[in-house]
Every structure is written in C-alpha cells, then in structure tokens.
C-alpha cells in the first residue's frame, strides 16, 4: 500500500544518501590504482542504435491478431542459468554445499559463456529481433570494488554481437545471483546494499551503456512476496528448518556469520533492500546515460478470487507483491516488465491448489496461458507507462503444448492491444533449456534444447512457430 508522506520523505532521504555515497565511491574507484578506469567513448560507427521503440499505438487500425510496427519479439536467458562456471556467485556456493536445497549444481550450464555467438545467431535465424540477457555481477566485481576489465570486455562482445546480428539487447543488471562477498555481508538486507548496487550499475553503464538497447535493474525482486504473501503455497523447500540451517552454514563458510541471498534470508528485509536498490540503480544508470530506457521486471500471476470471502486475501497479496513496485515505477521507471506464467486461485484461506483434473505444467502449476492477459490488464489499471512482457513460457517436454501455450498467450497480448493497452514487446522464457534453480535441469522451458554433455543445440518446432509470428507481426495458427 502507498506509504505516508513522512515515510516517503524518509525514503527519498535514504535514496539521496545512498546516491551521494555511491558518487563518492565511484570517484574513488575511477581514481584508484588497480581499478578499471573509464575508457574513451567508442567511435560513432560502434554506437548502439536508439532502441527507444515508439511502436504504432493506434490499435483501431490493427486487424485481429495483428501487432504494431516496432513490436519487440524475443527470447530470454539469465547469466547463471546458461553461462556455466559462475564460481564467484552466492548460488554456486549454495548449490555445492552439503546438504543443499538444489537438486543438482549448475556446473557448466549451457556453456553460453563460450557459445553466446552461436546462441544469439539463432534469434534472427528464427525471425526474432530481441535478446534479453543478464550481466553476472559476480564476474564483473568478484571482490568489493575490484572490477574485471576482462569480464566487462566479454559482455561488450556479447552486445556487439547483438548489434552485428540486428538484435536489440535488453539487458538485466541483476537476475537473482549476486557476488559471494555481497551475500556474506548480508546481501540485500545490508544497509550498504543499495550503494554497492548503484556503484556496480554506474561502472557497467559507463563502460557498456552506449551498446545497450534498453535495461532492467532487477529481475523479479518481488518473487518472495508473490509466493509467500498469502498462505497456501504447496511443496516448497524454502522457509523450512533445513533452509535456515543451510543459511547458517553458508555464513560460517563466508567467515562472517552472515549470508543472505535472493530467497535465502529475511524476506521482508530483502524486499525493502531491493526496492531501494532499484531506485538507486535507476538513478546511477540515468546519471551515466540519461537517454537509456530503464525499467524493472516483476513476477506476476493472474490473481482470481474463486471462493466467496477471498477478496481480503487478494488485497493482501496485491498490496505486498505489486503495489510497492507500481509506486516506485511511477517515478523510477521508463517501462515496466510483466513476467507471468499462470494464475493464482484465491479463497478466504489464501492460495488454492489447481482444480482436480486440470492440465499442469512440469513445474506443477496450472497450464493457463490466459494468465498473461489478466496480468497485463491489471498492471495497466495501476500504471500508465509502456509495458513489455519480459518473461512468459511453459515448462514441458511436449513441444505441441508449448506451441499451444504461446498461441494462447500471444492472443491475450493482441486482445490487450485492441483495448489500447500499451504493450510493446513479448520476450519468451526461455531461449534455451537451462538451469532452473532448485529444480536443476529437469524443467524444460526452452525454445531450443541443449544436450548438457555435448552442448549441441536443437531448435524445437515452438521456436519456429514463435519466429513465424514475429516475421509476420501477426498471430499464426499453431
């Protein structure tokens, strides 16, 4: 729920204080020995084109199933889930501890770190024009204040490859994983977290910003509130006694007695830290590149009250998971990323399981592509800035079901456009079958399968289907 005026003043003061500290630290970094110095600006021939997409908004001129000129069609990855060998990250530590909540470690993942050129080339081959990917903070800043020029150069090559292929790079600065040292000082719960994130954002933007098409600061920073804001989540390993014991042991391994990471820690404090980090990160990026379009991507469900008396639980969930991000986005976002996979059925006791007999995905939630339309409509009611679908997809080994899911989800986007909702792109999760966190490599979300022994890529029919929609800018029958 929106904060009081006094709370807003305290929050603004906190942001200003964090930004002042960040600016001081940045000057020290740029002047200090052994740190990365600012490079000269790249030549005009290497500058990124302006990707501030101004898609045609006259929905009345669109035929049914048609999409406006300039609409972004793409697929997404995340660094830790595809790159492999992310040894300096918090997640790598947690995956390789014994006991662990992870079904298996990420290991070499999809070896995307070495095969990014091959993977990016798949996008225009299929007909897609956008690649959403993340930078790995733990690679770029493996120790506090020490920025790796080699890793910055690596991501420069990734961005240059996107431009060479005619693909818009949509860059996420943080997709869950953080440097191990950051988690060991308290992660997003630390009072210094937002300053450290702003410093990282500034350094990356100063080095790579002119090659970026558009960016998001954080990926699904509201995920815990989405999952646990109301009772009823089934079959979760998080929040258990084993979970707390693993956090304690991770803190011992760090030698600090502290460890907080993504979904491992005090959920309320983590969420508060992420809200502040988005604001300071946004300001840091805008200071370096005022013209760069900056947003945030939020986890959403299509929330539906299906039993009398569930309205209170609906209000509680939305006020915890969505409203704080709508509030911050009104002043600190140029666009808003909607990430939705299914619906949430709500009753007076909280979240309800899917009805018996309904089709489920391999993640165990309901196969319900229409959820995307519901999430977009709800967001539009509360936020009048451009929307992008930054993630949407389905875990299944039956690719005919993925095609059906895409068709019905994209139809929902088309319905939103017909209602004059400003949706400017659809980014599918995911490009590759990749590491899915606690579930390891079991779930298959990818448009492209990966043999995790040979790293051979195989394009699925669903990838061709989505590419045909993108080529024609029109919904196609599956």
List where the protein language model places each region:
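N-terminal secretory signal peptides
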Residues: 1-24
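Compositionally biased, intrinsically disordered low-complexity segments enriched
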Residues: 11, 15, 25-28, 51-53, ...
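Alpha-helical and His/Cys-centered functional microenvironments
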Residues: 13, 17, 32, 179
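N-terminal twin-arginine translocation
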Residues: 22-31, 36-58
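Non-catalytic scaffold segments within catalytic domains of secreted glycoside hydrolases
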Residues: 53-114, 120, 124-126, 140-478
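Active-site gating/metal-coordination segments in enzymes
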Residues: 132-135
């Amino acid at each position: 729920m929106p904060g009081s005026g006094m709370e807003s003043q305290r929050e603004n003061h906190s942001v200003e204080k964090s930004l002042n500290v960040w600016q001081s630290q940045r000057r020290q970094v740029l002047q200090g020995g052994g740190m990365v110095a600012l490079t000269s600006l790249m030549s005009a021939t290497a500058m990124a084109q302006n990707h501030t997409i101004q898609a045609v908004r006259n929905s009345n001129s669109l035929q049914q199933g048609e999409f406006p000129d300039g609409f972004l069609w793409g697929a997404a990855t995340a660094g830790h889930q595809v790159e492999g060998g992310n040894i300096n990250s918090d997640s790598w530590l947690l995956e390789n501890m014994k006991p662990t909540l992870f079904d298996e470690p990420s290991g070499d993942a999809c070896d995307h770190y070495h095969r990014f050129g091959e993977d990016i080339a798949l996008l225009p081959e299929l007909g897609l024009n956008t690649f959403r990917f993340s930078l790995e903070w733990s690679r770029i800043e493996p120790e506090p204040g020490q920025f790796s020029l080699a890793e910055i150069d690596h991501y420069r090559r990734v961005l240059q490859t996107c431009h060479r292929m005619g693909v818009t790079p949509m860059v996420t600065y943080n997709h869950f994983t953080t440097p191990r040292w950051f988690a060991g000082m308290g992660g997003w719960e630390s009072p210094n977290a937002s300053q450290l994130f702003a410093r990282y954002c500034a350094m990356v933007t100063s080095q790579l910003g002119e090659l970026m098409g558009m960016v998001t600061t954080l990926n699904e920073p509201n995920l815990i509130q989405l999952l646990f804001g109301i009772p009823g989540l089934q079959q979760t390993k998080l929040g258990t006694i084993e979970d707390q014991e693993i956090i304690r042991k991770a803190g011992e391994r760090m030698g600090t007695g502290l460890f907080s990471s993504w979904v491992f820690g005090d959920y309320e404090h983590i969420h508060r830290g992420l809200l502040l980090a988005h604001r300071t990160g946004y300001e840091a990026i805008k200071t370096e590149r005022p013209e760069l379009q900056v947003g945030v991507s939020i986890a959403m469900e299509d929330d539906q009250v299906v039993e009398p008396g569930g309205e209170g639980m609906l209000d509680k969930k939305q006020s915890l998971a969505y409203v704080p991000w709508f509030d911050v986005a009104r002043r600190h976002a140029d666009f808003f990323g909607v990430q939705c996979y299914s619906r949430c059925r709500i009753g007076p006791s909280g979240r309800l399981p899917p009805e018996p007999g309904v089709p489920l995905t391999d993640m165990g939630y309901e196969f319900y592509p229409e959820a995307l339309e519901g999430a977009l409509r709800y967001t539009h009611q509360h936020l009048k800035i451009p929307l992008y679908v930054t993630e949407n997809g389905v875990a299944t080994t039956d690719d005919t079901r993925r095609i059906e899911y895409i068709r019905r989800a994209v139809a929902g986007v088309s319905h939103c456009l017909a209602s004059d909702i400003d949706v400017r792109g659809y980014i599918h999760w995911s490009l590759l079958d990749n590491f899915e966190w606690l579930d390891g490599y079991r779930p298959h979300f990818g448009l492209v399968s990966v043999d995790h022994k040979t790293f051979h890529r195989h394009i699925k029919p669903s990838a061709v289907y989505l590419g045909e929609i993108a080529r024609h800018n029109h919904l196609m029958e599956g």
